[in-house]
């Protein structure tokens, strides 16, 4: 995810003598814990000013364009800035930011130099842990418990642990030890995976979003008491044990799901609050109104049940992401009650004087949700520590960050850095996905640049790994899959833009449904009610009763599960759960026994597509290339060096055939086929074809035949029987020129135009010697014409011209080839005739003039 170890070494302990392959005494003697700052560039003076002493500037020394300054600092967090020729600037090598007073600065986090630290290196099946002493040089007082099976090298101060015999799955080691002087080492976490999952990349993800209270009720003893909220807005009893049961049943694995994203675990508010309409009462069943920072909501389960759920997921090769709320809390939250200064006192977002964009950093979502002030260092540090606690305590694998654009940039940068330093010690990526809700504002790419730029703002080397792809959602779900206002050429274009408009290396999350929008099947179904209605009195969408709605969802998921990124399935979408706007889009998950045949068929098809994605490197990691698009048909390829997948979507009511010059694909889903370079696509279909071993494309791609150019006039002395296009250079015997001119002028449509012979049935090609000169001539052909590919001894050749062109019947080899359409031959003869006639007439006229 991020290479934060470099930043850690540079900014917190920075100058460290070599610690490997040296004598222990030498290591102790040369160890140095001063902090080094550097700035590169041309300047007259460069200084550092920091929170350690705002009254004293520290001059930096220049050496070959690099300015260096060293300080000995006590443990703590410090604001600072560089002063370059009297201009105050951030440290360009340090992305971390913080506020001192009302001024934003670079910040540095300094550790206690007396305490030892660990350095981690995982290479293949070998984990190497280096002990780095504190400033007094004392060695380790023993071996960390989780390294008890390792080998110790006292010279290099290293433990080496062989992990080849570890069970497949996730392992998290905690390294804790004192040195011989009693100094406590900074503890270190070392999470890593063994087995197939060790090769996992987050672009391999198929994410399944679970709104826990609305999923499966696995333990009725913790069912919540009704709050009296409006219909659809109260607690309904889903819990962590229900999720565990579904993991252990194999439901997710059978669907190809390998990542679960669950809504917040925190204890949420009791009672109700007013919905945005100010009329309806709603509860906190969704978890986004936290009141406790480090407590599992008892209506969802216990800490032990959360740990059991995560362990079950890991045993199944499934990663678990938490949902972390960074923008706000509920007014009953402990922090708001005890530390009101940690929160902004802003207007209510979306009201007439409080624009969502202009006031995005300090407005409140509702009056009962205080907005976190990330400029307050105490608040910032506490919310980051809480995030680390959840990830560590429950061995989670990543997080979805809620409402990203409503917090200061430093909130994301600092959170990302701390998570990276704590959990990515052995190279295991922790995926951080953001929610930056944007839109799609028009067909022109330029019109959408602000949308892309806002999402990109929070990603990159020091930012989030990816975000929900809101631009793509609104471009294609709003306009293609649900309304049909736009066609598959539009779908192709905006899918391609998601590949080139986002921060390089980011792993975006495409989706067609979520807890914030009406269910996709209800948006595609116009027969049961307005999909944007929220409340029962307005008339809510019902269960669709037609095939078209389910076909639309399959088209959408056929695209989603084969497109690049880490696609997300919203719980229930896989079988076509219906519903209007929030909260009606959050029905409880229905068991398969309550599905109808349409729902069962949809779920089976989406499961097959998910499994296919899981099994295909091309569908997970391949590049996206559009091969064909029309209003109703889209064909694109996902390809790696070793394999490729051909995805074929047809929303039309008729079959289609497309010439694609591809070969060696095997149908893996659906019924589209490629035969001799022709792709046949059934109506209303989704198909995926797979080709393995892409190492030799030359033998797998049917090349277009090269057009042979030459003389095509059969009466010419240089007639080329292989020529398909006339080169205009035919030559003739001198004594036949006038005859040819006269004949061609008088008979500019030759007798050949009257020959109508089926090119596939001209002659019997069974090699039983039934073909003869008589048959050939009766068919209007020329017997024993010369053709270089039929040059074996005693070969019989018949050349026939009909309305389809020249047909060469190479009898002994049972070959037949159409060279040139007859119309082209006739036009060529006419052209040559006119030219020759003009020459003759010109000569005669000149003779008459006595020239």
Language-model segments: residues:
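Primarily marks secretory-pathway-exposed extracellular/lumenal segments that are disulfide-
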Residues: 20-24, 699-817, 833
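Aromatic-rich carbohydrate-binding modules that target alpha-glucans
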Residues: 28-77, 85-111, 142-159
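Loop/helix patches that line or flank the sugar-binding groove of alpha-linked glycan CAZymes
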Residues: 218-235, 493, 502-663, 681-682, ...
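C-terminal membrane-anchoring or membrane-association module
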Residues: 836-851
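Substrate-binding/active-site clefts of carbohydrate-active enzymes
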Residues: 201, 205, 215-394, 410-425, ...
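Active-site-proximal helices and loops of the catalytic beta/alpha 8
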Residues: 139-141, 318, 386-388, 392-397, ...
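C-terminal beta-strand-rich structural cap/linker in extracellular carbohydrate-active enzymes
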Residues: 79-80, 676-700
């Amino acid at each position: 995810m991020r290479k934060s170890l470099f930043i850690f070494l540079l900014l917190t302990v920075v100058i460290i003598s070599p610690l490997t392959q040296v004598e222990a005494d030498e290591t102790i003697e040369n160890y140095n814990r001063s902090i080094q700052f550097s700035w590169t560039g041309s300047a007259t003076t460069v200084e550092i000013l920091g929170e350690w002493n705002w009254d004293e500037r520290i001059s930096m020394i220049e050496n070959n364009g690099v300015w260096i300054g060293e300080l000995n600092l006590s443990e703590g967090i410090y604001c600072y800035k560089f002063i370059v020729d009297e201009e105050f600037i951030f440290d360009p090598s340090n992305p971390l930011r913080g506020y001192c007073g009302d001024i934003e600065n670079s910040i540095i986090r300094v550790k206690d130099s007396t305490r030892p630290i660990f350095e981690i290196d995982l290479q293949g099946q070998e984990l190497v842990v280096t002990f780095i002493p504190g400033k007094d040089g004392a060695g380790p007082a023993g071996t960390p418990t989780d390294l008890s099976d390792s080998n110790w090298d006292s010279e290099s101060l290293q433990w080496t642990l062989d992990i080849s015999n570890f069970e497949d799955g996730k392992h998290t080691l905690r390294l804790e030890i004192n040195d011989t002087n009693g100094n406590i080492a900074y503890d270190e976490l070392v999470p890593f995976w063994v087995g197939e999952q060790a090769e996992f990349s987050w672009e391999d993800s198929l994410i399944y979003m679970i709104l826990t209270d609305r999923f499966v009720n696995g333990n009725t003893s913790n069912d919540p008491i009704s709050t009296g909220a409006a219909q659809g807005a109260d607690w309904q009893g889903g819990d962590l044990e229900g999720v565990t049961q579904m993991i252990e049943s194999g439901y997710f694995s059978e669907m190809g799901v390998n990542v679960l994203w669950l809504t917040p675990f925190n204890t949420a508010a009791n009672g109700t609050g007013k919905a945005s309409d100010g009329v309806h009462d709603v509860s906190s069943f969704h978890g986004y109104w936290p009141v406790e920072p480090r407590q599992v909501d008892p209506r969802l389960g216990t800490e032990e049940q959360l740990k059991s759920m995560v362990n079950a997921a890991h045993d199944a090769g499934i990663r678990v992401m938490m949902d972390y709320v960074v923008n706000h809390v509920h007014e009953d939250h402990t922090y708001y009650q005890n530390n009101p200064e940690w929160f902004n006192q802003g207007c209510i977002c979306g009201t007439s004087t409080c624009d969502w964009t202009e006031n995005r950093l300090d407005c409140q979502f509702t009056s009962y949700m205080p907005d976190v002030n990330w400029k307050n260092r105490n608040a910032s540090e506490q919310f980051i520590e809480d995030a680390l606690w959840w990830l560590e305590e429950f061995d989670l694998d990543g997080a979805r960050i809620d409402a990203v654009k409503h917090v200061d940039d430093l909130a994301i940068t600092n959170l990302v850095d701390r998570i990276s330093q704590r959990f990515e010690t052995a190279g295991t990526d922790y995926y951080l996905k953001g929610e930056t809700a944007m839109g799609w504002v028009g067909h022109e790419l330029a019109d959408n640049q602000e949308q892309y730029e806002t999402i990109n703002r929070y990603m990159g080397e020091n930012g989030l790994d990816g975000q929900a792809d809101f631009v793509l959602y609104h471009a294609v779900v709003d306009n293609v899959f649900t309304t049909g206002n736009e066609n598959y050429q539009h779908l192709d274009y905006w899918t391609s833009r998601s590949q080139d408009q986002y921060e390089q290396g980011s792993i975006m999350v495409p989706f067609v449904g979520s807890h914030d929008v009406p269910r996709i099947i209800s948006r595609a179904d116009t027969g049961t009610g307005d999909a944007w209605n929220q409340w029962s009195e307005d008339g809510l969408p019902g269960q669709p009763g037609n095939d078209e709605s389910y076909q639309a969802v399959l088209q959408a998921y056929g695209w989603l599960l084969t497109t690049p990124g880490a696609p997300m399935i919203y719980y229930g979408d896989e079988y076509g759960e219906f519903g209007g706007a929030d909260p009606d889009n959050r029905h409880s998950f229905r068991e398969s026994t309550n599905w109808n045949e349409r729902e069962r068929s949809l779920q089976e098809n989406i499961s097959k597509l998910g499994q296919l994605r899981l099994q295909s490197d091309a569908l997970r990691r391949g590049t996206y290339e559009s091969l064909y698009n029309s209003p109703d048909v889209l064909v694109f390829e996902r390809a790696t060096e070793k394999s490729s997948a051909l995805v074929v979507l047809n929303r039309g009511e008729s079959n289609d055939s497309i010439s694609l010059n591809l070969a060696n694909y095997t149908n893996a889903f659906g019924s589209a086929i490629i035969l001799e370079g022709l792709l046949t696509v059934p109506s209303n279909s989704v198909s995926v074809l797979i080709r393995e071993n892409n190492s030799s494309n030359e033998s797998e791609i049917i090349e277009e035949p090269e057009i042979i150019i030459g003389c095509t006039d059969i009466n010419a002395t240089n007639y080329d029987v292989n020529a398909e296009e006339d080169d205009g250079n035919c030559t003739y015997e001198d004594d036949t020129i006038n005859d040819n001119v006269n004949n061609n002028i008088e008979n500019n449509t030759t007798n050949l135009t009257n020959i109508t012979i089926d090119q596939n049935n001209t002659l019997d090609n069974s090699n039983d010697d039934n073909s003869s000169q008589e048959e050939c001539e009766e068919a209007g052909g020329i017997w024993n014409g010369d053709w270089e590919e039929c040059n074996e001894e005693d070969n019989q050749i018949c050349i026939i011209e009909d309305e389809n062109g020249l047909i060469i019947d190479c009898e002994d080899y049972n070959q037949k080839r159409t060279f040139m359409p007859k119309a082209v031959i006739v036009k060529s003869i006419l052209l040559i005739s006119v030219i020759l006639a003009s020459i003759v007439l010109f000569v005669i006229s000149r003779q008459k003039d006595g020239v």
